Amino acid sequence: MKKVLSIILGGGAGTRLYPLTKLRAKPAVPVAGKYRLIDIPVSNCINSEIFKIYVLTQFNSASLNRHIARTYNFTGFNEGFVEVLAAQQTPENPNWFQGTADAVRQYLWLMEEWDVEEYLILSGDHLYRMDYRQFIQRHRDTGADITLSVIPIDERRASDFGLMKIDDSGRIIDFSEKPKGEALTQMQVDTSVLGLTKEQAQKQPYIASMGIYVFKKEVLFKLLRESVERTDFGKEIIPDASKDYNVQAYLFDDYWEDIGTIEAFYHANLALTQQPQPPFSFYDEHAPIYTRARYLPPTKLLDCQITESIIGEGCILKNCRIQHSVLGVRSRIESGCVIEESLLMGADFYQASVERQCSLIENDIPVGIGTDTIIRGAIIDKNARIGHDVKIVNKDNVQEAERENQGFYIRSGIVVVLKNAVIPDGTII
């Protein structure tokens, strides 16, 4: 895989994941208690022996830069690197990134310097585990100019995706963006061509793009330089290229989830706690997900009742009940609390005991969850200070609300408490 360079698209302003992207780039959003979204594609690359990795981003890239610099240091005897490339304005191009393809186009001068044969283009907000070596080998074996990784899906979910049709050789011959009705029926294909059994093919007669592509070097450069007005890979570049180039489909038949919205992000995190077998597991020593080593102490539990939950390292939990939840590193939960079906991202630091005591005496709220607080169906971002006897339960079943001055939003019925927010004692949300 020395002849492959990976480009991870960090996305735009992250409006679908707002307010989690208020102070950070989308790839830097914490996931599963201790990781960040960027760790998923980077780990997949490392496990696939791809060590040349660029991450393209446009907004709030400081925490992403810091995380990557501390985590992925390939100094030594190979050419490996993980580098963040932020959008920049130049005399030749005064614009920011206009789309996924435009982001790559603006850095072609840098990509060109490397002696590689293929470019692997990935998204920064998906949860999955994939060996890209098999994907790239299929690309080479079929002599493809472009290969798309696709998933088989059933009729119920099909209209939510960009679908495609293939011929008997696996070549993509048609695209349709989120079709409905008769247009949807026309996009049915025989997915057994890609390796499914007849029974599986009948249940899942559609294929959808995962937003993962591999390009021949000369094809990528030609398409981006000749079609300057086309700014998006999935909607413009690849559908147009399928007319003149050999665009192949590669079937990925394992867990894959786009977690680019608050609702999908919330459910994907809580699904990690499912028993006996979650849909995605971080407990795979043959293909681990890497992240920054923090050297934190073990978690301390004092008279707690915990069921179906994930607790990050360095947490302190006192006489509380945690059910079907994910708690991030350095989470602090005081006595009498009930946390149900919630994602707590933890904290970036510990408050000293003296500082916490002074905060309580002065009626300030320390970092963490105060005594007798109930949190249900919520996401609590990092370093939140939640007082005692608070109820975050969305009691009125509100679906959408913006209360930034009060420290929270509601997205798809999920209460999202902002990073560094302060929720006073006795508050009911």
Swiss-Prot record:
PANTHER family (UniProt xref): GLUCOSE-1-PHOSPHATE ADENYLYLTRANSFERASE LARGE SUBUNIT 1, CHLOROPLASTIC-RELATED, GLUCOSE-1-PHOSPHATE ADENYLYLTRANSFERASE-RELATED
UniProt KW keywords: ATP-binding, Carbohydrate metabolism, Glycogen biosynthesis, Glycogen metabolism, Nucleotide-binding, Nucleotidyltransferase, Transferase
InterPro entries: ADP-Glc_PPase, ADP_Glu_pyroP_CS, GlgC_bac, NTP_transferase_dom, Nucleotide-diphossugar_trans, Trimer_LpxA-like_sf
Family named by the database record: Belongs to the bacterial/plant glucose-1-phosphate adenylyltransferase family.
Cellular component per GO, a single term: carboxysome
Reaction catalyzed: alpha-D-glucose 1-phosphate + ATP + H(+) = ADP-alpha-D-glucose + diphosphate
Gene transcribed to yield this protein: glgC
Binding site for alpha-D-glucose 1-phosphate: G162, E177, K178, S209
A single MF term (Gene Ontology): structural constituent of carboxysome shell
Pathway the protein acts in: Glycan biosynthesis; glycogen biosynthesis
Listed EC numbers: 2.7.7.27
Protein name (Swiss-Prot/TrEMBL): Glucose-1-phosphate adenylyltransferase
Disulfide bonds: none
GO biological-process terms attached to the record: glycogen biosynthetic process
Signal sequence, renumbered to the chain: none
Domain of life the protein comes from: Bacteria
Function of the molecule: Involved in the biosynthesis of ADP-glucose, a building block required for the elongation reactions to produce glycogen. Catalyzes the reaction between ATP and alpha-D-glucose 1-phosphate (G1P) to produce pyrophosphate and ADP-Glc.
